[in-house]
Amino acid sequence: MPTNWLLPESIADVLPSEARKIEELRRRMLDLFRTYGYELVMPPMLEYIESLLSGTGHDLDLKTFKLVDQLSGRTIGLRADITPQVARIDAHLLNRAGVTRLCYAGSVLHTRPSGFHVTREPLQIGAEIYGHAGLEADLEIQELMLAALSAAGLADVRLDLCHVGVVAALLEQSPIAARIQDDLFTALAAKDVPALRAITVDLPPAQRDAINLLPALYGGVDVLARARKQLPALPAIGRALDDLATLAERAGGATVNIDLADLRGYHYHSGVMFTAYVAGVPNAVARGGRYDKVGEAFGRARPATGFSLDLREVAGISPVEARAAAIHAPWSGDAKLREAIAALRAAGEIVIQSLPGHPEDLEEFAYDRQLVEESGRWIVKPRNASI
C-alpha cells in the first residue's frame, strides 16, 4: 500500500471546516489589533540562525529547524517564534524613537511539539508594544490578549500572573546566582521543592528561605498580601507586587491567579508575565509579558511587551460558527444570470453555482438564499426546502 500521502508526526493538513474557522478568527483578531493602532508586519519564514536566536535562550534553539543556505553556505533556521523577528524589525529596520505598536500572524515550525496533541506547525498571532517601559504598556497588552480571546468566543478565562523581578531581586548580588540560575528557574517552574532546597543550599539564609517560599505563593489575588508579609521588604519586590496587583485589578472578567514560581520563558522575560487558560484545556491558550532585553542583540535595546497565541489551537476550542451564509445559483449560460451573480459577488456575497450533475454541499456553506428567475429577471429569494 502506498504511504507517500503520510505527513510527518505532529504535522497535519488544515481542512476546509477548520481553515474557515482559523481564517475567521485571524481576521477578527487582526481587525481588533488595528482598532488599537497596531501595524501589521510580515517577517520571513527563514533567517540566518544568529538573528533568529538572538536574545532568546536555549529553549528556542532546541525548537528551531536548521539547514545550510545553498547561496551563502551559512546556517539558516526556520522560525520557531515570530517575536524575535518583530523585535529585529523594530530595532533595526523601523528605528523609531517613540512608541511602536506592531502585530503579526504567520506559521512557525517546531522540531518537537510543545505538549500532548499539539501541532509542530502553530499559526502564531500576536501583538507587541515597543518604546514604553511603564506598566501602562503591559496593561494594554493584557487587555488586548483578553479581548482577542473574547473575540474567539472563549469564556471562563483564567489569567495566571507572575513577575521575574521577584526572583531577580532575591538573587541580586549573589556570587553564585549565575551558576545556579538555570537549575533554579527550572525547579521553580516545576515547583520541585526538594530540588529547590538542594540548589539553594549555598545561598545566604534570608535569600534561600525566601526562594523556597515561592512555590507556595500560588493562588488568588490574596497571595500578594501573603507575599508582602513573607518575602524580604526589598524595593524591587514591592514594585513587582504592586505591578501584579494593578494587572489583577484590570483583568476584567477573567479569574486571576498569582503564581510567583511560574517562570517559564525566563531567558528573555524581564518583568511581568501573564498566561491565559480556559476551562477543559490543559495547555495555555495565550502567553505574554515584558522582554526589554531582546532588542540588545540587534544593537538597540528598547522596552518591549507583547503576547501571542496559536490560532490553530484556539480555533479547535472556539465556539465561533464559521459556516458562511451563501446564495445558491443554478448552472446556466444565461447572460443575465452571470450579470446578477457578478453584481452580488462585487457586493461581498458568496454565490455558488451548482455544476451540472452535482448537488450543492450543504455542510460547507449555509445556503440561506437562492437566485431564481422571475419574468426574465434573476432575483434573490429565501431558500426553499428544495431547489
UniProtKB/Swiss-Prot annotation:
Pathway: Amino-acid biosynthesis; L-histidine biosynthesis; L-histidine from 5-phospho-alpha-D-ribose 1-diphosphate: step 1/9. The keyword Transcription does not apply. It holds the Pfam family tRNA-synt_His. GO terms for biological process: histidyl-tRNA aminoacylation; L-histidine biosynthetic process. Keywords: Amino-acid biosynthesis, Cytoplasm, Histidine biosynthesis. Gene3D superfamilies: Bira Bifunctional Protein, Domain 2. GO terms for molecular function: histidine-tRNA ligase activity. It is found in: Cytoplasm. It comes from the Bacteria. SUPFAM superfamilies: Class II aaRS and biotin synthetases. CDD domains: HisRS-like_core. One of its GO terms (cellular component) is cytoplasm. Belongs to the class-II aminoacyl-tRNA synthetase family. HisZ subfamily. HAMAP family: HisZ. NCBIfam families: hisZ_biosyn_reg, PRK12292.1-1, PRK12421.1. This function is generally fulfilled by the C-terminal part of HisG, which is missing in some bacteria such as this one. Heteromultimer composed of HisG and HisZ subunits. Required for the first step of histidine biosynthesis. May allow the feedback regulation of ATP phosphoribosyltransferase activity by histidine. This is ATP phosphoribosyltransferase regulatory subunit. The gene is hisZ.
